[in-house]
């Protein structure tokens, strides 16, 4: 499980995964992503560092896999112990935001419409300051197309006034970020003639695993 993932935005390439816990989950990325992490060194400031995982804090695992060159992206949450009710509620709210994105894209509406509806729901939940990062480093998207590269188009964001095409694949990844950590979920979806269906596990793999 190694190597880099190609990105459309030159000259970036992406590591295969980000694993962050607690306060490391509140560290922003050097590129347009909700979660960055400390990395092992300031000169490699992305992903896992040397911070020890503490009891009852959220652990986010965001992994990218390439099968015969085609990319999928998936995020799940873990906790050593028990997650607080506050973090549980945040995760439930992000699942509702995800369902909104999937529903709008399933209807063949534009990616911008999916952003508008899902972002509006997140604001209604009270996440305007924390959705996809903390100000001033918030990312302004809720999903990105995937294919031969990680950051394909269209994107669930303002300005993308076209639908996800039939045969298109989209990683949908609402997350909320705080100084004390982050939480969210992500799965890759494909739109076919019958609508949206998950390529990765979606609800078949638990959103949260306690150990």
Where are these regions (language model features)?
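Active-site neighborhoods and metal-handling regions in enzymes and metal-associated proteins
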Residues: 1-211
């Amino acid at each position: 499980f190694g190597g880099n993932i190609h990105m459309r935005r030159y000259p970036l390439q992406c590591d295969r995964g980000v694993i962050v816990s607690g306060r490391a989950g509140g560290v922003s990325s050097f590129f347009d992503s909700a979660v960055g992490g400390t990395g092992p060194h300031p000169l490699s400031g992305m992903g896992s560092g040397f911070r020890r995982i503490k009891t009852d804090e959220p652990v986010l695992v965001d992994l990218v896999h390439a099968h015969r060159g085609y990319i999928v992206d998936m995020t799940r949450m873990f906790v050593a112990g028990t997650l607080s009710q506050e973090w549980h509620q945040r995760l439930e709210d992000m699942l509702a935001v995800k369902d909104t994105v999937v529903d709008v894209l399933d209807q063949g509406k534009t990616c911008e419409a999916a952003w508008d509806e899902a972002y509006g729901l997140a604001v209604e939940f009270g996440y305007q300051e924390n959705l996809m990062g903390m100000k001033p480093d918030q990312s302004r998207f809720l999903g990105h197309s995937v294919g031969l590269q990680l950051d394909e188009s269209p994107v669930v964001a303002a300005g993308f006034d076209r639908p996800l095409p039939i045969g298109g694949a989209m990683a949908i990844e609402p997350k909320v970020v705080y100084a004390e950590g982050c939480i969210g979920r992500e799965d890759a979806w494909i739109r076919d003639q019958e609508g949206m269906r998950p390529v990765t596990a979606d609800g078949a793999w638990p959103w949260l695993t306690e150990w």
